[in-house]
Amino acid sequence: MDAAVIRQALEEKYLAPTRKERPLYSGIEVEMPILNLKKEAVDFDLVHRTAERFMDICGFVPETRDDEGQVILAADPVTGDSLSFDCSYNNIELSLGKAQDLQLAKIRFFHYYDVLQELFSAHDYTLTGMGVNPYRIYNHNVPIPNGRYRMLFHHLHSYPRYRSLTMYFHHHPAFGTFSSASQVQLDVMDTDLITIFRAFSRLEPVKALLFSNSVLLGENNGMICVRDMFWENSTHGINPHNVGMYECDFYSEEELLDYISSTSLYCVERDGKYLNFAPTPLLAYMELPEIEGEYYDPESGGFETYTFKPELADLQYLRTFKYEDLTYRGTVEFRSCCTQPIRDTFCVAAFHLGLLEKLHELDELLENEHVLYHQGYTASELRHLFVRRQYPPYISKDGLNRLVGEILDLARDGLAARGMEEESFLDPLYDRWHRKSNPAMDMLRMLEEGKSIEDVILLYR
């Protein structure tokens, strides 16, 4: 396939939407683990009944069902808010439609959350704000029974096929069934794109300090955001350009498109079947005459082979898991934050929204500071260290603390400039800054002091 044709299609998908004048909206997605407080496996039938009851109460309409007729996605036809299940029925997600005012978004979110909690609590269940399900060992960590999630589960479990690669694979391929994130999408303009990727990529080590909340109890207890490892050391990370951070700065839209061109596809859909195949870089994929993939066959209960030809339309399946992801909607999705304690949910969106308002000041600050950078370490290396509570010897703890405070002040000033009284959403982050802590470190400290994991679950819900 002509490379120029592919390039034009990428530009239309990713860049064209950013050139349209529009208001600044935010889209907020919060994943949460469902916990059975009896320390037994989550009863999926109970989850299905709860979802149906939630729809009745909140006026949501079913949009997607699994192969057994159960609701995967339901939405409010007016606001665009949605309830969904991510990867498995052990995880629930509340997503808010386009919002300009975080205060109004908060009201809607907590209404939905309170309804769910009341329904679940009647059966000794609860939701909580943790990035790794602390009761994962009790659950049936199986995928939602539909083509997409069975394909994804199969893809992640195929890592033994790639043992010849010089990369480490962790042994938790079902991580999507017990890990949760708090994500925000913000509308962006093409004139700001390169600055956004540069500044927010450099910000990632600081975000690790403020937002880490994913401890894999019993393993890797020194790691406060194990979600990074889940993605990077899985089959998603076979092509490192598909996950994590950017190891380079972009100076033009052309360089950004070059990077997107280097990412890999690992699935497409044909004849209603989701096909999985070895991750293949986009340009190489388009040059192949045909590819052999695998799909789940409900009749056999296993995976069968299916040979297909690449098509330009397959660009719709090009999906990466970068910490800053440019989407086809003209938004940048910020993906690196763990689910937060529920009371602090909106600190994630507020932090990113405030800093986007002060984008150029943030870029200048991170370009010229010498606490983190200009000392031989990249942003990616620093984040990898920080999520392990390790610090290069050159870093001054006092200097780092001052830098984090300056960044929080920038976010606060950005929110103040919006004039919507959203600054209070940053209060949890200022508290963490003053205490030099984050939810993961707070949890580990509580456990060291003799508190139970149930104490943490109830505190974070």
Predicted regions and their residues:
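Carboxylate/His-rich catalytic cores and anion/metal-binding grooves
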Residues: 116, 120-138
